[in-house]
A protein has these predicted regions:
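Polar low-complexity intrinsically disordered regions
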Residues: 1-9, 217, 251-253
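Class I SAM-dependent transferase core
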Residues: 34-62
Length: 253
């Protein structure tokens, strides 16, 4: 029998370093929970656990907690169209399309600068593919945006998921270009805002401290007061979408 697990319990106190020095935190306290969630998120990223996750057979590369929160958002918001930049293997597209299939409405537009042949084949042969349209091109190019707009009717509600190039400048450009598609009450979700948290990780980069999607979101919110962070979708604590669920408020609200 593992004595640590089934016999003597490990110490419930852990030490953390703060600006004021070292302090002990009870792991069962709210403060301790926040510390453990932060450590788990960072270690999870370094060990690439999100790469172990699939949705209906397709790799999705997202935290299970974020998948649950996105599911909840789609069910509550029920957009007519979801636009995603950053197709990768296509798992997220299949997630959105399968939820829309259950809801009996809606479709998904996936945008990527390069959609590899085997990924396209996996997506287009999937049972959820009838609700998916793929557009190959840079998400910030005018021609790509025109192709996206041409597939959206004027009266349709739109949700946007940004998960492509994660530099500050690119994400900011995406936010500026795709925000007009989202009406009052609609959402933009920005992924991979974990980057500044893992800038010091073995697989991270020091430049991520400033060059990351979270910085782009802060820049965008400073100039677009009609959008706000909906922190209710971060309540599971472990997330790659810190301040990433952006809700467009009603005009003059």
């Amino acid at each position: 029998m593992n004595e640590t697990t089934h016999g003597t319990q490990p110490d419930r106190l852990t030490k953390i370093k703060t600006a004021e020095g070292e302090k002990e935190v009870d792991i069962y306290s709210p403060e301790g929970f926040a510390v453990v969630a932060n450590l788990w998120t960072r270690s999870n990223w370094q060990n690439k656990l999100s790469y172990e996750v699939t949705w209906l057979g397709i790799p999705i590369i997202q935290l299970p907690e974020d998948i649950l929160m996105v599911q909840e958002l789609i069910y509550k918001n029920r957009p007519d169209v979801i636009v995603e930049s950053g197709v990768a293997h296509g798992g997220a597209l299949v997630l959105y399309a399968s939820l829309m299939e259950l809801l009996g409405r809606g479709r998904v537009i996936g945008v990527d600068i390069e959609i590899r042949k085997y990924n396209r084949l996996a997506i287009e042969s999937h049972p959820a593919s009838r609700r998916i349209t793929l557009i190959e091109g840079s998400s910030t190019d005018a021609s790509t945006l025109d192709a996206v707009r041409s597939r959206i009717q004027p009266n349709e509600s739109v949700m946007v998921m940004l998960d492509s190039n994660h530099t500050r400048d690119h994400v900011r450009a995406e936010l500026d270009r795709y925000a007009p598609l989202v009406g009052p009450g609609g959402y933009i979700v920005v992924f991979d805002e974990v980057m500044p948290m893992v800038a010091d990780a073995p697989n991270g980069k020091p430049t991520w401290d400033a060059d990351n999607p979270l910085s782009a979101v802060r820049d965008f919110l400073a100039k677009n007061p009609d959008f706000e962070v909906d922190a209710s979708y971060e309540r599971l604590a472990t997330t790659y979408c810190h301040s990433g669920f952006l809700r467009r408020m009603a005009t003059n609200s």
